[in-house]
């Protein structure tokens, strides 16, 4: 039986969803129906939310799990009347933090994600634009401005990893797909050689690569197991020969891959 989980916020819901998802991921034997409800910022919206929570409780026969980052005390009290198990993220952590810092919280909605008061905003946008402009080897003449250059076979996870690092940490990451021609030459493309210190390799299990490519080009040579196995074998050999640090992306999330890359390469996050 699935449990229902709500991520409720009077702002975008990013914080409630991120922390809630991380906590629920620790219970991989339990399936969840997950719902994000942003901008619950008036008593009327809160009462409507209570109706949704109670309906889910009646349907499931179990209390929904509620993760909330509601700042307004009145709205929190309305939500607390629901038949749900509430995890109030702000009140759980802010009160002891206020005591430790001997200061009062501003209790501002959406504080961490605001544009005007956040000097990291433009860094984030510039990093995302860099990742998009330098995706899939489309441009190589800006590699001198890159913090990292991810290399690997097509569809091994380079693009989502670059975008995640850009969004979360302001890292300017380019990516370059190693092709069959590169493998036949048994050496790095010239454009990558001069940026060797920025290179990090992604590899992947051949059967997983086959499944991913099959969704894009089914029943093609590109997605065949034999082709995928060949490319992975040759690229891993190239990584060893050129002494390029690398990670197998098969069993890791994009968050884990990104963290491992930054640690391995010693790249500092532009913001945290």
UniProtKB/Swiss-Prot annotation:
Pfam families: Kinase-PPPase. Keywords: Kinase, Nucleotide-binding, Serine/threonine-protein kinase, Transferase. This is Putative phosphoenolpyruvate synthase regulatory protein. Belongs to the pyruvate, phosphate/water dikinase regulatory protein family. PSRP subfamily. Bifunctional serine/threonine kinase and phosphorylase involved in the regulation of the phosphoenolpyruvate synthase (PEPS) by catalyzing its phosphorylation/dephosphorylation. GO terms for molecular function: ADP binding; ATP binding; phosphotransferase activity, phosphate group as acceptor; protein serine/threonine kinase activity. ADP binds at residues 152-159. InterPro entries: Kinase-pyrophosphorylase (IPR005177), PSRP (IPR026530). It catalyses: [pyruvate, water dikinase] + ADP = [pyruvate, water dikinase]-phosphate + AMP + H(+); [pyruvate, water dikinase]-phosphate + phosphate + H(+) = [pyruvate, water dikinase] + diphosphate. Its EC number is 2.7.11.33, 2.7.4.28. It is an enzyme of class 2 (transferase).
């Amino acid at each position: 039986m699935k449990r229902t989980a709500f991520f409720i916020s009077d702002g975008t819901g990013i914080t409630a969803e991120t922390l809630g998802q991380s906590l629920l991921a620790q219970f991989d034997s339990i399936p969840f129906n997950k719902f994000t409800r942003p901008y619950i910022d008036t008593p009327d919206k809160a009462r409507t939310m209570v109706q949704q929570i109670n309906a889910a409780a009646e349907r499931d026969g179990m209390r929904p799990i509620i993760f909330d980052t509601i700042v307004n005390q009145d709205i929190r009290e309305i939500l607390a009347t629901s038949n749900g198990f509430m995890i109030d993220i702000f009140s759980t952590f802010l009160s002891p933090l206020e005591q430790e810092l001997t200061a009062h919280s501003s209790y501002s909605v959406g504080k961490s994600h605001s544009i005007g008061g956040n000097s990291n905003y433009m860094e984030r946008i510039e990093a995302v634009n860099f990742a998009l402009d330098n995706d899939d080897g489309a441009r190589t003449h800006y590699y001198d401005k890159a913090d990292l250059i991810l290399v690997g076979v097509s569809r091994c996870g380079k693009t989502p990893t670059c975008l995640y690092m850009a969004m979360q940490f302001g890292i300017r990451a380019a990516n370059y797909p190693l092709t069959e021609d590169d493998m036949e030459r048994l050496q790095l493309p010239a454009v990558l050689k001069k940026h060797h210190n920025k290179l990090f390799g992604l590899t992947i299990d051949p059967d997983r690569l086959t499944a991913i490519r099959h969704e894009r080009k089914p029943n093609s040579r590109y997605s065949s197991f034999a082709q995928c196995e060949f490319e992975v074998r040759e690229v891993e050999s190239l990584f060893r020969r050129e002494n390029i640090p690398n990670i197998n992306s098969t069993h890791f999330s994009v968050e884990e891959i990104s963290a491992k890359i930054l640690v391995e390469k010693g790249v500092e996050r532009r913001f945290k």
